[in-house]
Amino acid sequence: MDNQNGRISIALLPFLAHGHISPFFELAKQLAKRNCNVFLCSTPINLSSIKDKDSSASIKLVELHLPSSPDLPPHYHTTNGLPSHLMLPLRNAFETAGPTFSEILKTLNPDLLIYDFNPSWAPEIASSHNIPAVYFLTTAAASSSIGLHAFKNPGEKYPFPDFYDNSNITPEPPSADNMKLLHDFIACFERSCDIILIKSFRELEGKYIDLLSTLSDKTLVPVGPLVQDPMGHNEDPKTEQIINWLDKRAESTVVFVCFGSEYFLSNEELEEVAIGLEISTVNFIWAVRLIEGEKKGILPEGFVQRVGDRGLVVEGWAPQARILGHSSTGGFVSHCGWSSIAESMKFGVPVIAMARHLDQPLNGKLAAEVGVGMEVVRDENGKYKREGIAEVIRKVVVEKSGEVIRRKARELSEKMKEKGEQEIDRALEELVQICKKKKDEQ
């Protein structure tokens, strides 16, 4: 800690998923803007995706090299585009990087470490170097509180049964892998120094933040949605094409369709989404992720020709924040990853929830509970069907029945704008106090 000006240095270690790298990077930018020296540590492949977006001299990108193998070469040291069967090997490789990270911490000697739910060794290694560590929770308080409640109060009813009713659920013994993940998750809360940072805001899930604070016996400090500035860097040709297309559409008449950076739709799912968009008659931009080697014959034959200029299909990555922040965008067909929900709320765009797995169904339910989204209902076989997709798109974007949802999304966005960056300011105050307390103990 710089004694002359109170400037602190902070190291950040996110998990290797884009949905974690992105909020950690946005947090790093906010801390750097407030006169902190920041070190963001991750694998070279993850850092390469943000190098061009880093304009602050106060953020240093620090490479963490994982052990490589023929099955897990360096370009797979990220969950972005990672084949599902390599997810566990990647986690295992990350778990073995503790000694390497220990050397990095020894060299950097930061005043504080901000860590993620994985790897499990981060707070212990920080402690071995006499560095305080704070957990940064990048998922919703609502979904996180369910797991922590079940662990702390087994057999007891969850306090908000309208959101999650566990009264008729008989828990099954978790597998060894899931048990380890659960214990690692609990340890993240227990090892955090005094507070827990959370990517959230009270206007969306205040009661769940309070519940999680009680369950963890730690002060939860929201840092807001941490959405990247959509105008923060130069536009590439693809972005330019998309924005030009949006500029020609009327206000709030376009749905953006995106299912995240890690999930590939099956051919059947692609067809249902495509026909759903077609019969909805609503304008759309669809970011389609295609598995390498399977690029032909996936979208229904003639689909692109039939929708014509009403739809824009973009292969691979799309500038999500730029699209959601555009005045023509009036709905977001989303997999309901927490970062996507936060971005949608930041820009006042209602969510059409097509959740996939993990915490996503709960995130979609939360958006619906608050009144800023609507869930697409699965059929009796657990599948999304074209008619249901089209119906919810039209309700949310076009029909009079969706006006309440559209208004609530706008109102929530306005509240967040009025609040500005108060959450980050308070979070930094808490972090400085932790560093001062540690220094006084030495």
Swiss-Prot record:
Disulfide bond residue pairs: none
Stated induction or repression of this protein's expression: Induced by methyl jasmonate (MeJA) in roots and leaves. Induced by A.niger mycelium-derived elicitor, thus improving ginsenosides production in adventitious roots culture.
Query: What is the uppermost EC class here?
Result: transferase
| UniProt GO BP | response to molecule of fungal origin; saponin biosynthetic process; terpene biosynthetic process; terpenoid biosynthetic process
Tissue specificity: Expressed at higher levels in roots than in leaves.
> What are the binding positions for an anthocyanidin in this chain?
20
Tell me the pathway. Secondary metabolite biosynthesis; terpenoid biosynthesis
Report which reactions are catalysed by this protein.
Answer: (20S)-ginsenoside F2 + UDP-alpha-D-glucose = (20S)-ginsenoside Rd + UDP + H(+); (20S)-ginsenoside Rh2 + UDP-alpha-D-glucose = (20S)-ginsenoside Rg3 + UDP + H(+)
Recite the UniProt keywords alphabetically. Answer: Glycosyltransferase, Isoprene biosynthesis, Transferase
Alphabetically, the GO molecular function entries are: UDP-glycosyltransferase activity
Q: Where does UDP-alpha-D-glucose bind?
A: 138, 318, 320, 335, 338, 340, 343, 359-360
* Functional note: Component of the dammarane-type triterpene saponins (e.g. PPD-type ginsenosides or panaxosides) biosynthetic pathway. Glycosyltransferase that catalyzes the conversion of ginsenoside Rh2 to ginsenoside Rg3. Triggers the biosynthesis of ginsenoside Rd from ginsenoside F2.
Q: Which PANTHER family match?
A: GLYCOSYLTRANSFERASE
Protein name according to UniProt: UDP-glucosyltransferase 29
Species whose genome carries this gene: Panax ginseng (Korean ginseng)
